[in-house]
Amino acid sequence: MKKFIDTVDNLLDQSLRGFAKAHADIVQLNAQPHFVSRIKPAAPGKVALISGGGSGHEPLHSGFVGAGMLDAACPGQVFTSPTPDQMLAAAQAVENGGGVLFIVKNYAGDVMNFEIASEMLDCPNATVLVCDDVSFPKSHSTGRRGVAGTLIVEKIVGAAAEAGADLAACKALGDKVNQVTASMGVALSSCTVPALGKPTFDIGDNEIEMGVGIHGERGRERIAIRSATEIVDYLAGIIDDDLKPQQGQAALLHINGFGATPLMELHLIYELASLFWEKRGLNICRSLVGNYTTSLDMAGCSITLSLLDDELIRWWDAPVHTAALRWGC
């Protein structure tokens, strides 16, 4: 294993301190328990948006703390859920009279710990559960996983909260975005968790994992490597079958890198995916390409499609000022 590490034990702490210093105009770090929050408090009465999860997916979630998105993020250890104490401390620090909305990816540890924090809070709160991974059917035992679509929920709901939407409206909007968003990923290689020191799974030089999870979970199937067009058609076909978009439907296309795939290849994937849906009459009117929901050093990417209406377009276009997303301000 070759990584820039002093010791595994202090990796997260050093990384978070560096992140907070590098973006000191936007965020601040609470050392114990760990959470990242805005440096400038939100307006009184604003709904506080909080998310979090295991580290190793940067810039998710800390990179999305700031005006127009999250009020705080709770980073756990690598691929490990943050604790209820982190979530409770973050909520108490940023709640400002409008209640708290937790945005939670659908993983058992995250769901359980956010539920505990929710029960401990003494202010109005609600939860949006993100489950955009269509690698498995909705009837899967634990439900679908939350993956790259999470940032789309955070951006759109964050804009509405910034504009003064109340807790019920923010919760309803988050659920709406989740229902019209679908993602699926492919891995060309595994990732290496620092504490483990070796790849999380073995994969042959001529194999790819279709439907891989962002923690290296096994996907839908393992197949022989094939052309980029064939890979995109496979992923986009499953997403299309799930969402069943209508001709002329407006949509956001998000190509997300897992950490070790060059932008040259991510833009190639965007070109192929956009052609897939343009041929079917979809109006790809918004886009996002880059490494936003990563899996440490995994080579691969995911495709996310979100169906849009005028309301969702307005909130997506609204100003945002975070470490990882910034426009209109």
Q: Regions from the language model: what does each represent?
A:
Residues 73-78, 121-143, 279-284:
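Short, acidic/small-residue loops that bind anionic groups at enzyme active sites
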Residues 1-49, 310-329:
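N-terminal amphipathic/basic leader segments beginning at the initiator methionine
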Residues 111-124, 130, 265-271:
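Short Gly/Thr/Asp-enriched flexible loops that form oxyanion-binding sites at enzyme active sites
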Residues 57, 64-66, 70-96, 240:
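Glycine-rich oxoanion-binding loops at beta->alpha junctions
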Residues 238-329:
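C-terminal non-catalytic interaction/assembly regions of soluble proteins
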Residues 163-268:
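Mixed-charge interfacial surface used for oligomerization/domain docking
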Residues 44-52, 61-74, 135-136, 208-224:
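Gly-rich Lys/Arg/Thr-decorated short loops/hinges at beta-loop-alpha junctions or inter-strand turns
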Residues 128-180:
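Short alpha-helices
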